[in-house]
């Protein structure tokens, strides 16, 4: 999938918005048999790093797809911005950070 100029611009703006809001964007390329993914987590309380809950969106890479970091980020950010999220407790995100699963 090639990104259009509009998609590239949206990705940059959304990425900046997520980071300024205390959110997390993490992309992991495929490793061995595991698929690659992009995770976007936004605290439900604005700019609160230790929020009790996060709105989380994912973009997964299928086995036969080539995973492109920027495309994965765009898909996950698009889902985040348009409300296609799930809520996760903050301790799960904190545990992932401690285990070095996300940046």
Roles of regions detected by a PLM:
Residues 1-103:
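Catalytic phosphate/metal-binding cores of nucleic-acid and nucleotide-processing enzymes, i.e., regions
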């Amino acid at each position: 999938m090639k990104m259009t100029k509009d998609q590239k611009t949206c990705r940059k703006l959304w990425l900046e918005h997520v980071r300024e809001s205390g959110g997390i964007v993490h992309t992991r390329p495929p490793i061995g048999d595991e698929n690659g993914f992009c995770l976007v987590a936004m605290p439900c309380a604005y700019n609160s790093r230790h929020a009790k809950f996060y709105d989380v969106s994912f973009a997964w890479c299928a086995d036969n797809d080539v995973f492109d970091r920027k495309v994965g980020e765009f898909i996950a950010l698009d889902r985040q911005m348009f409300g296609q999220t799930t809520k996760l407790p903050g301790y799960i995100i904190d545990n992932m950070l401690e285990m070095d699963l996300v940046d």
